[in-house]
Amino acid sequence: MITTVQEISKWRNLCFIRMQSRKWYPVLKKTPLVADGRKIIKHADKVPHPGEIIHPFYQPTAIEQFTACATEYNPSLLDGKKIAPSLIKHPVSLKTILVDSKLKFDDIRGVNRWLMEFVARRQHQRNIVLTPASKSVRSFHVLHLSSTDIAKLRGLENVLSEIENTNDLQSRVESVNNELQNIFDRDSKQTRLFCEDILAYLIKNYGNSTENLILLINVTEMQLFSRLDQMKAMNIILYHILCKVEANENPPYSPTLVTALENLLAAINNRFFPGRCENSLHPIVIEQLLSYFIKTGNLNESKNFLGHLIKKGILPEATIINRYLEAIDVHFDKSTKIFDIRSKFAFIADLAPIIENYGTIDLFKFLIPMCRHFDELCSLLNIIRKSNNAKQAVDSTLPIFIKKVLTFTKDPMINSGNLSTVFNIVSPIYGQNVPSEFVEKFILSFALQGNYTMMAHMIDTYKIKLSHKYQLQIIRALKNSERNHALKNTGAVGYNKEFKKYFIEKYLNCTEREALRP
């Protein structure tokens, strides 16, 4: 059995399958992007490098690889359709742009090497091990303030009480900041009184209202360029701020609060880093920020923090991932438009290791509608088949898979073959005893294709009881098939009039038979 690209390459000179030559699309093609209405030049003169493809779950099977390596003219994957989401360099501006690429090669040369690298990258994603972040928060709660130190903060607490009803935020920030400075001026150099401990204490005890929390966030930002000189200190403060945000408000958050927190994050980046600060943030704080940005609907920042967690080998909580997927659906309104699906792939590209090894039912349900080719659907189904919760996942998703199979083409014979493939993939999960409720859905789907042979085979093999209600469903499906495929495959084995007559007489009651008479 040929299972590797190396073996495939040995056979390529023996097995040439000449396929109909397809005209290559223009090297440069102007395409409007729905997102901003601008037009860009889409670079589409070659198959993207395997590292440029961001599809998180497509894996060509051994047969797909063999066919590509054995096809002399225009070998392809995914039938050469323009559905492989890729991040490529614009040929002129050299900016990275998101496009749907065709995995269609000019000729057979180099196909095996391309496949070897693509498969190796997919294997690397499968081998990534993720572990949940430690939930120990003791280090965030240990504030190094003695009772003597807290007594020194009485003046600061009084200032907070006095300015509580003041509307001028800037004057309130200056008042608190001045009192902080007075505390440090009065304090002896021997005392271990640190700014981060004071701010964390104030946030924990006085940040119970949105107004006070905004005030303390602004004070923290002012202290960044004086006494807050370590990221360890900022981890403590951010943890307490985000805990209060979670406790005080339900989304949508106050715009002033959102602005204050995002200004603080920008100031932290400017203070400590030329770019972004994720590498120095504690995983728990990163997860808090991820949750916060998901709730505010900021998908770009959500993607950044989610991707950073995964790169650090940390498995985000399932509830956070589900909320992230929901936010994507809300943003795109569950759209199945080509551009929206391409953009969705950009937001879930980092989830590849989670899909492969830690996929949940909700995640799989999110991915099924994104498949634009049957081979993508099979890749996803094979991932589910190998997962630890395979049976539960298939129980919940199989009806969606069956429905999705019929969306790729209108050809009843191709649809019948694809339905059979799906059935053969899932049946071993049930020990060949596929539940009758699923078998009945397959039968109805075969009826929609006018495939009398497969209907009869499944009814007999799985001893399906044909109730009056179910027979009516079959009849409706067959009538739809006759309308949709009136001129196709009428003489094919399993679809012709003889098979129709045999099926009607053997499986339908007298009353139901009349409904299908010509």
Swiss-Prot record:
Transit peptide boundaries: 1-19
Transmembrane intervals: none
A Pfam family it matches: AEP1
GO cellular component entries: mitochondrion
Keywords: Mitochondrion, Transit peptide, Translation regulation
MF terms in GO: translation regulator activity
Record keyword Mitochondrion present: yes
InterPro entries: Aep1
Subcellular location: Mitochondrion
Stated role: Required for translation of the mitochondrial OLI1 transcript encoding subunit 9 of mitochondrial ATP synthase.
Protein family (similarity comment): Belongs to the AEP1 family.
Name of protein: ATPase expression protein 1, mitochondrial
Organism: Saccharomyces cerevisiae (strain Lalvin EC1118 / Prise de mousse)
Name of the gene: AEP1
